[in-house]
Amino acid sequence: MAFMAPARADIDNPMTRAVLNVYAQQLSEDPKDYETYLNRATVYYSNNEYLRALSDADNAIKYIPEKDAETRIRALTLRANIYLQTERPAEALRDLDATVALDPNSYVNVYLRANTRYTLGQYAGAREDYNRLLRLNPRSTEAMIGLARIAVKENNLGTATQYLDDAVASDPNNADIYVRRANVRRSMGNGSGAVEDIMLALSTDASNARATKLLVDMANTDYAVVIEGITRAIEQAPRVAMFVYLRAYIQQAHFHYKAALTDYNTIITQNLNDYRGIYAGTARCRYALGQYDSALADIDQALAAAPDNADNHILRAQILRALGRRVDAYSAAARALALRPNNTQALIELGLTAYSQEQYSQAADLFGEATMTAEGADAARAYMLRASVLEEHLNQPVAAAGFYRHVAEITAPQTQQNATTGAQPSATASDATAILSADPAMLRPLALLHCGERQAADAAMAAILALPDADGAHAFEAACYYAQAAKTYADIKKGKSAQGNTDMDTAFHYLEQALDHGYGDLHRLRDDTDAPANIAPLRTDARFTALYARFAHLF
């Protein structure tokens, strides 16, 4: 990643467009005006228009006189940053070599080159550059962190620890230093130490977004370690509302709704914070725990403080639908759509409320409208919902099959890779599998199942189950898949079949596994019937009743 980037602007902003028009006019008058090329490249770069920025940077470098070293350094540095943003570190290194040759004492470019060498696995060269930074600034925390990262790669953990401690000692009031040390500690396998550093960073700077993001990222793979670390921080500072809120937020994100609700209530009852928006969190938890009346009261409190919050109106619609108040649910979803026209989630919820009132044609139309603006998981879900209505209620099996096929195609691994090409890389490799509900590939097994491709569907489900599953969410999706597979075979055979029985057994295996991992969404377990993914076919089996009783403590 590049060391620094300009503040992002809006390329469609009238002022930005006016500036670009001026640059275009200047270049039409003098096609070799390198300063204008460089200035326009900077504007494009600041707006993520990397191909255009690269073209202008190339032209600037081509026309800059050799004697103008200062401008050449600026242009080479910009082009190096463009290469780094587009994941071309080898090309970036060539430009950075040139900038350092022109100015060996440029702290920024030496640091950029050190990081680029590290990315390319050139640890000896990276070490040389980090040591050069220390000569330029003996208190350089960037250099110390960089040397620590190299030491970790070379398995010199004692040396790495010393560099990290030196970095913190040199700037103990800088929250970012703790975040950097946390990243390195995480790479060392020291998750507890990493969480401790993140909490120190937040104690130093409560608004540090990097610290919060890293904590959330870590929870996706090291949930227990993160919760333990936050809990230790709360024990040391029990009245810091932010720490309690963070724990609640992470617990909620990982389907531990009962624990999250307890923390939210602690903030409310102990008056740790008067933020009314917290009632949206309690409402979400109560909805997931099947406490629908209390959830409605809480979401109404949240809306009293922020009546134009569309997301809260969507949640209110979901709660009302769970209560059987279908007309009121439709009104709430319509209000959300009025506040946020063409919003995919609002359109889907409006479609589901229409479906609950047996207005199947209207539901299909709303799901179709949602597909026109949706992306990723929302798009896959909207297509699946539309296909389900067409297949089960509107006698349009051919159209339904086409939509199921479309979902299978847009969730194929290569399609997913192409869809993200050019996007900025995630902070960690685990980010790609971080948020289950945001991954459209989760619907791929069901889409393939409805396409009649059972072997491919099973393989897609196996790929999901091979991913880390800290909270049981993947296992629950597997239970949904095999429950629906069992239902499909029962429909085909007009009764029980050997394959259907096997699928039911497999579904219960994964349901038990999900609950063993603490999956605590009672709404999806007991009440949810929304297509395409639910466990409704399991609920009449005695094994379901037994599991529900055994894991009642989760709810």
Tell what function each PLM region has.
Residues 14, 48, 87, 121, ...:
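Residue-level detector of the short coil/turn that links helix A to helix B
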Residues 19, 53, 92, 126, ...:
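Single-residue signature of alpha-solenoid repeat helices
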Residues 25-26, 59-60, 98-99, 132-133, ...:
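Canonical positions in the second alpha-helix
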Residues 29, 63-67, 102, 136, ...:
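Structural marker of alpha-solenoid helical repeat scaffolds
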Residues 45, 84, 111, 118, ...:
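Position-specific recognition of the canonical hydrophobic site in helix A of tetratricopeptide repeat
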Residues 186, 192-195, 209, 213-215, ...:
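Alpha-helical protein-protein interaction modules
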